[in-house]
């Protein structure tokens, strides 16, 4: 793992030492067209907007000769469960990889999803990413991909049609979830977890298939959940996060000038993501309040009980593999636990 990380750094230093690409010189370079798949279904979602800015930046840095099309989930005829296969086959050259659904291929990424292990702040999430980065780089290489950016989304909250008097006893309430560990926690809270893709949550909530939805606040407003939900609970679940990865063969085939453009824009995306997440959360909450949604906090005594309910799930998860155990130990050390 250390050799992989060192090799990546050496390659990056070589690429970054190149002089900036001039548009005139770029006329002799090949035209390259890539496709990037997003995990979102709406073009206005902040991660789609931010990745589109990366694509624009790459095009500008290469005189328009390296273009990246950002496709929404489902736009190409397949959804996120096929993203790994699509990028491995070079059907797409770039993809958002979310640890929330990538645990089937890289189980140790589940450390990002351990509810209440961290407090939901970006600083703590970054500590977990840094502590497990060598493990992740090695795992990505086995999938034939390489990350050029990493960024967080907002914390995972709950929007409900009905008030929730006691979070330690949901009394059979059906809650939409999308991560396995969240499902286990909802069960411990005496609720019923229901797996649903984001594109189906509005109609499911409208028809009563679920009474509450677990997701980030921007996703709530992107899917108009303020029309069917009336109570926003600051659950503070682990934020989703994205690695933006590229196909290794497609990347290696690029001229060094294009690689440099990707790295520079990848760094910009990582920095931009930090600023975006706070802004979009505030905007989404304001929009929901205008629609009559009440923003509520979970009482401190209930939250303390929820942490006790969640903690055994961390150890249960860690026992599944040596990699999981290593990731949890690294995360705890980084967080001072």
Where are these regions (language model features)?
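Short, low-complexity disordered leader/linker segments with a strong preference
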Residues: 1-33
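N-terminal secretory/targeting leader peptides
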Residues: 25-123, 131-337
